[in-house]
Structure formats: structure tokens, C-alpha cells
């Protein structure tokens, strides 16, 4: 083949190789010496999907495969949006605290903030913060209420008229999503993003199957595609995974902005939140 390429008009060479055939390194080197462009189709790697890119890592040329390939500048813009949003959100969190803290102390003595270990990007644990909307024994009572869970298989927990929610103030801050505001601190720290996927608890994470884990291929978010798609009506965890996967595969700055605007609408109309 080298002799033919050497003596004939050849612009490019495309190698379509079955799995059992080794890459023809010598011919490719010869083509490189002659300045002829080469392409190699690797059948085994094609099964990994379309999101593949050749890049240099630590001096080695590698083929990287991911659920979504994004550029460095896109990640930078997303992080800058998170920082800006996190700063503004933390200011509002302080203002909200001034108003709800006294009521919380009267209705349910205890800390105003609630913290819990959640699983972040690629399974990295982090501590998430919220305004406490439930009574102090909420986690203990959760085990007793699992049979009333609306989500199948216990991969998430959601129930109608949850008795653990503090009467009055608890229902109000959950209905208006004010309980989520302390997460702006998580966003500022880099544990979370403005838009992403819901971070699971450790016990939920332990029950994940292989395809569930892809939800955490990105940073978890304060809001996301699932949250703005009528989350109160969704009771099948596989549907949650499908929406999260769709978001990750189609991610763009424009999609984030669209979800943020839709989130504002959902919060002010109260749709989708319970």
C-alpha cells in the first residue's frame, strides 16, 4: 500500500478495521512521512458513542470518550455564572435568615440550617446546606414512612402531606423554595452549580444501578431539567434519570439560561414544588 500511495494521487487514507485487526502503524507512519492524512475507524470504540475526541494528556495522545464533550471556555462561562449567582444568592440567603430564623425558633427549637452529606460529581461526597423545614427527628421518622414513599425502589423519597414538615413556616419555605437558598453557598464553594442534577443522599446512592450513576457525571445543581418539568407529578425514578441524562447530553450555556428562567416561573407560580 505504501508503494501505491507513494506513486499515485492520494489525498487521504481511511482505515476501516474490524476488532481483531491491529492498527497498521507502519503504513500510518509512512503516510505521515509523505504528508498524507490518515483516518482510523475503530469498530470497538464506535460502540462507546459519538462523543469522542483525540487530545493530549501528560504527553500522550489519547482518545477520550464522555457522555458530553464540552470546551474549556464553556466550563469557564458556567463557573463564572455560578460565582455571580452564588454571590447574589448568598446575600438573599442572609436577608431571608433574618425573617425566618425567629419564627423557626418558636415553631421548632433547634438550628435554623440543616446540613446533610450528599453525593456530588462522580460520587464525591459533600455537605449540602438548607434552611430546616422539618422537625428535628425528621431523619429518624423517614425510615418509618418509607412505605408511603411515592418513588419506586426507594431511590428518592417523596410523599404527599409529609408529617415531618414544620407546620406553617416549613410548608411555606418549601412551597416557595426558600429552603434551598443556603445551597448558594455550596455553589460558591464549587460543590454545586446553578443548574445540574439533584444530588442523592448516601443511602440513595448505595441503591444506584450502573446507568443511574451517570446522573452525577456533572456537578449537582440547585435547579435542573427535572425540577422544571413538574417534579411533583413524577413518581418514576427512571424518568428522573432520563431527564437528567437528556440535560447532560444536550448541555449548553443557552440550555442553562433557559432552565434558570423557567425555574423563576416555577417558583413564582408554585408549580411542581411540594
Question: Can you annotate each of these PLM segments?
Answer:
Residues 1-94, 274:
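N-terminal hydrophobic signal-anchor/signal peptide
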Residues 45-46, 51-55, 113-164, 223-244:
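Short, glycine-rich, amphipathic interfacial segments at transmembrane boundaries or analogous
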Residues 89, 168-176, 245-249:
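Short, well-ordered beta-strand elements within core beta-sheets of diverse protein domains
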Residues 155-219, 259-267:
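A short, structured surface patch at a secondary-structure boundary
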Residues 74-141, 186, 253, 258-274:
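A hydrophobic, helix-centered structural microdomain
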Residues 69, 238-253, 274:
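Compositionally biased, charge-rich terminal segments
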Amino acid at each position: 500500500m505504501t508503494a501505491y500511495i507513494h506513486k499515485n494521487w492520494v489525498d487521504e487514507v481511511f482505515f476501516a478495521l474490524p476488532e481483531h485487526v491491529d492498527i497498521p502503524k507502519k503504513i500510518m507512519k509512512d503516510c505521515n512521512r509523505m504528508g498524507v492524512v490518515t483516518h482510523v475507524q475503530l469498530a470497538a470504540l464506535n460502540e462507546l458513542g459519538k462523543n469522542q475526541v483525540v487530545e493530549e494528556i501528560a504527553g500522550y495522545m489519547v482518545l477520550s470518550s464522555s457522555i458530553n464533550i464540552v470546551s474549556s471556555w464553556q466550563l469557564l462561562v458556567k463557573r463564572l455564572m455560578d460565582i455571580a449567582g452564588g454571590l447574589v444568592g448568598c446575600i438573599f440567603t442572609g436577608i431571608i435568615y433574618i425573617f425566618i430564623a425567629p419564627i423557626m425558633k418558636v415553631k421548632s427549637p433547634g438550628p435554623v440550617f440543616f446540613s446533610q452529606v450528599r453525593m456530588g460529581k462522580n460520587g464525591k461526597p459533600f455537605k449540602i446546606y438548607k434552611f430546616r423545614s422539618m422537625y428535628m427527628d425528621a431523619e429518624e421518622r423517614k425510615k418509618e414512612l418509607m412505605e408511603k414513599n411515592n418513588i419506586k425502589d426507594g431511590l428518592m423519597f417523596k410523599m404527599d402531606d409529609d408529617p415531618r414538615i414544620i407546620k406553617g413556616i416549613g410548608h411555606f419555605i418549601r412551597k416557595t423554595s426558600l429552603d434551598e437558598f443556603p445551597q448558594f453557598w455550596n455553589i460558591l464553594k464549587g460543590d454545586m452549580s446553578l443548574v445540574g442534577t439533584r444530588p442523592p443522599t448516601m443511602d440513595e446512592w448505595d441503591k444506584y444501578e450502573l446507568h443511574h450513576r451517570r446522573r452525577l457525571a456533572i456537578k449537582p445543581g440547585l435547579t435542573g431539567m427535572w425540577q422544571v418539568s413538574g417534579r411533583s407529578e413524577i413518581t418514576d425514578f427512571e424518568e428522573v434519570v432520563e431527564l437528567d441524562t437528556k440535560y447532560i447530553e444536550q448541555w449548553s450555556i443557552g440550555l442553562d439560561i433557559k432552565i434558570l428562567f423557567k425555574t423563576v416561573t416555577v417558583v413564582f407560580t408554585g408549580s411542581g414544588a411540594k
